[in-house]
């Protein structure tokens, strides 16, 4: 995700990767942190939290590595020569800013402000919600938006819908994450259910945009057909997961 984000931001901004040394160093630190995290989990040092399983000492390493990568990506976006940004840039740039925020916030709440018991689980569920519904989803949508526009030879169809979807997915994807029946105050699962409904509306809007954008790509070289078919398959998976996630929020 990090490498393709750097490539698309550079390509869309019609510039080169700025401060590549930070990106390279951050990538090394990030991979070291991931490796130490897996070793820690396998050696029995897991935290016991579903989304933040890695040991305490690993999370600052991951945050530092991603922060260095983020510096390079932010600088690359700021040095773009094309002032108008595309939906692919919106999604990828936001994902770049979002992961360190939720990772750092969850780390501070659990390990610095000492959230314990159910409160620690609520923070953990909030992190999972943001990591999956905002970071990973935005990276995927950014990649699909870029390649659909590239293969069709035009911008996305329905830019207004794309703006609407972006904000709906960002706002309602960042709250909730608590399943119905969880041992928490009743308003938390209710809030999660409501946010899931609005998130589904945003998912439908961005699916509409990407579906109509890829419909214009009818004349492709043979070398591009497989790649484009893969992007279409990814769009189908996104739609299917969005539907399943929507209905799962109403199941106890």
What are these regions (language model features)?
Residues 28-33, 65, 95-103, 137, ...:
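Hydrophobic membrane-spanning alpha-helices of multi-pass integral membrane proteins
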Residues 87-109, 121, 125-127, 163, ...:
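Aromatic- and glycine-enriched pocket-lining scaffold segments that form the walls
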């Amino acid at each position: 995700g990090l490498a393709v984000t750097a490539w698309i931001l550079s390509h869309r901004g019609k510039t080169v990767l700025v401060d590549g040394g930070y990106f390279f160093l951050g990538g090394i630190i990030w991979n070291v942190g991931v490796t130490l995290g897996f070793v820690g989990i396998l050696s029995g040092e897991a935290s016991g939290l579903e989304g933040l399983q890695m040991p305490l000492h690993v999370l600052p390493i991951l945050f530092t590595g991603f922060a260095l990568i983020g510096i390079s990506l932010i600088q690359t976006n700021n040095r773009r020569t094309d002032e108008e940004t595309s939906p692919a840039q919106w999604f990828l740039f936001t994902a770049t800013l979002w992961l360190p925020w939720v990772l750092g916030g969850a780390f501070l709440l659990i390990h610095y402000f000492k959230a314990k018991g159910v409160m620690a689980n609520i923070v953990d569920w909030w992190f999972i919600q943001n990591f999956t519904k905002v970071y990973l989803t935005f990276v995927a949508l950014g990649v699909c938006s870029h390649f659909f526009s590239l293969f069709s030879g035009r911008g996305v169809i329905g830019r207004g819908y794309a703006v609407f979807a972006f904000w709906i997915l960002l706002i309602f994807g960042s709250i909730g994450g608590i399943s119905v029946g969880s041992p928490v105050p009743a308003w938390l699962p209710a809030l999660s259910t409501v946010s899931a409904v609005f998130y589904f509306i945003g998912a439908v809007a961005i699916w509409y945009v990407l579906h109509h954008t890829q419909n214009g790509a009818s004349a492709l070289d043979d070398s591009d057909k497989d790649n484009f078919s893969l992007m279409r398959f990814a769009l189908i998976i996104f739609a299917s997961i969005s539907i399943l996630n929507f209905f799962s929020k109403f199941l106890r």
